[in-house]
Amino acid sequence: MITIVAPAKINLFLRICGKTDDGYHLLDSAVVFTHFGDHLTIEPAHDDQLAIIGEFASGLANADDNLVMTALNGFRAAGGVIGGLSITLEKNIPVGAGLGGGSADAAALLRAVNRLSTAPLDDDALYRLAASLGADVPVCLAGGCQRIAGIGETMTPV
């Protein structure tokens, strides 16, 4: 069993520079991550299951549509090898608060399963998968203090 923190994301500044044809905002921003966040506890299981607990659990529709499970399925589809998992997501980040909670959860799951995998993904494959899950997932995967541009795909450590 492992427990991993999915830290909340704080935008130090955010400038919207335009919009793409598919509706994404073009950004110039700097972000940092807090010590506060959601917690994912992961342990081997026969079948995949996700339990959502915590103060803000009721703000999520259901476990089946959660980005954590989408990330897990995407990891396997990308060639990562991992057995069945029981995942408990403790929601400490308010849902819809602009703190990147869902993206942080998906990124934390990817970090954890890649470490546990008997056939982990290389960094490029992991970041491509993260980008396919959402614009904030790659920066949440990178962590630290980042200057981001585009729709979030261009990151420079600060």
Language-model-derived ranges and their functions:
Residues A97-S103:
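Acidic (Asp/Glu-rich) catalytic motifs at the cytosolic membrane interface
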Residues G74, A112, R128-S132:
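Generic structural signal for isolated residues within well-ordered alpha-helices
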Residues S103-L116:
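Short, small-residue alpha-helix embedded
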Residues P120-V158:
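Alpha/beta catalytic cores of group-transfer enzymes, especially the acyltransferase/condensing modules
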Residues M1-A97, R115-A119, D124:
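ATP-binding N-lobe of GHMP and related small-molecule kinases
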Residues K9, D105, D136:
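Acidic active-site catalytic centers that drive phospho-/nucleotidyl reactions
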